[in-house]
Amino acid sequence: MNEGNKFIRRHDLTSLIRLTIAYKAIFAMAEKQRGTITKLAKDFLISRTFVYMLANSLLETSQIKANDFFPPAIKENSSIDHILSLRLEGKCSIGSISTYLKRFGFKKSSVGYISQILNQFGSVLPNTVTLKEEETVKIVYASDEIFSKTKAILITADPISTAILKIEIVDKRTAEAWINHWETIEDNGCIPISLVCDGGTALIKGHKDYLSDLIRQHDTYHGIAHVLGIWDTRFEKNAYDAIEKEYDSNVVLNSEMDENKLTGIIKKYEESQKNTQEKIEAYESFHYLYVSMINELDIFDKKGKLRDRQKAEANIEACLDLLETEIELKKPVKKIRRILDDLLNYFEIAKVILEELLVKMPDIDEEGLRSLCLAWQWGKKKIKAKSPRRRRNCAQKEVYYYEEAEMFIAKEFGKVKDQVLKELNEIVQSSSIVECINSIIRPYLNSSKNQITQETLNLIMFYLNHRRYIAEKRKKQTPYELLTGQAQSKDWLDMLMEKYETNCH
């Protein structure tokens, strides 16, 4: 099969076979036989949607009025596929789905019916990812809290596979709620090797009471960039505003005016010049310290060697001292100092990973390993880069160091590269994956008018874990495949329908 083709013409499915499939499907739905559609799909290696399509085609070409002879099973099942696809893939509101179904002649199209269908399907799904019996995976927990109006939602994801491990609505955000949350994940086979989260009180206490033997990595984005980024923008805006005022004063000065007013105008212009210079210097000083602190988060130096954690912490502390004394930023500095002890914990994880790599691959060229480390680091920066220019620069550096690594590691370079990157990806600096998932989930919450239910969250989690990526490095893979290493042969919608039919049966 050509991997690039999503659909292919099945020449082995003759007209007679298609007619047989359609007839059996119509009969099964008329008799309300559960599981027949799924069995037909399995027996003939086709999708359930294709089975319904054949059944509909037979009814139309035979000019049979389904309502006169059979219950409206085909329309109902077909509308269910539409409901699930529109809600999860299209992120449509229930009201919009109702309008769509009415337009295309589906009888059961009321808001109440759609809500009932979504609730029924969500009720048969767990809110925790489930592995096969006795199967376990060791992963990083990236945990955070999101909100739907007053409802708190706890979510934990695997930052490497992007799979949602658990999502649940809770009454209160307490340490006990987080402990129960993590216990359930662990009971289902996902063993934590470290925890990445922000500085939430309940999260910190939950870690202390339940996961104290694991490293807790504070989110580096929330630790520095989130705190100081807004100040960087503010200082820059102040500088540009001052430049604009100076320019306006200069225009007035160069225009014709009474000599009696000239002295006052000159004085005002000189004040504008002085103010502009002060604002520019303030911005440049702050920006230099801000960028210096961000650079201290790098794991590897310019030669690809692991940086010293103590030196990095000392440099950040020196920058904080200057921000406090010279620029007088008291509160932001205090906030960063509060979490500084946990901010660079990933250095310890990186140290262990590099040691394990040298044990697993004793013959690896050390220069080549350093080049791979730099390529990996520039790849991470490329993902984080916001400006196209910055992104291009990072991409060029990434390619350069991969090429350099290949010069040192000529033999089985692809295999060595994949192994090294797999290990390095376990170094997690932030819980940005949860922020990303939050941005994906937010449209569902908004289209629900924030009347979110656990059943809806179960559906969203199932879809996000089993839908296939269509671009970037995870292209053609699903989060669940990446988490478990097991191939997923079916579409998420077929899997969901089968799961529903099995549970109902």
Predicted regions and their residues:
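C-terminal domain-tail junction helix/linker
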Residues: 277-307, 368-390, 397-416, 420-431, ...
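Short, basic interhelical loop/turn and adjoining N-cap
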Residues: 36-54, 102-113
